[in-house]
Amino acid sequence: MTEHNHNHDVELDISNEEELLTLFDENGNEVLYRKMLEFYHPEFKKEYVILAEEGAQSDDDDMIELIPMINEPDESGDGGKLVPIETDEEWDMIEEVVNTNMEE
């Protein structure tokens, strides 16, 4: 079994500035999402965004579903496209970042 050695002392540039994004679901319907968190991780050399569907409500038993994505900038460095998370290591890192930052 391999051990994942994450550098927990890595300084992340984290933005909590909320922004609304319109994305399309698998049926081509527009869905409005709120960007909850955005950060660059130097170990993976990628920028990540954490989204939540706008208007989604949580109750005592259920939490709002957060959707992590990789933000790949275009050639000019602006905008870009959102792509799915690629590895288990990235999922583990994102879970740790989200848990740490959403508690604050």
From Swiss-Prot:
Coiled coil: none annotated. It comes from the Bacteria. InterPro entries: UPF0473 (IPR009711). Pfam families: DUF1292 (PF06949). NCBIfam families: PRK13678.1-1. Belongs to the UPF0473 family. This is UPF0473 protein SH1304. The lineage of its organism: Bacteria, Bacillati, Bacillota, Bacilli, Bacillales.
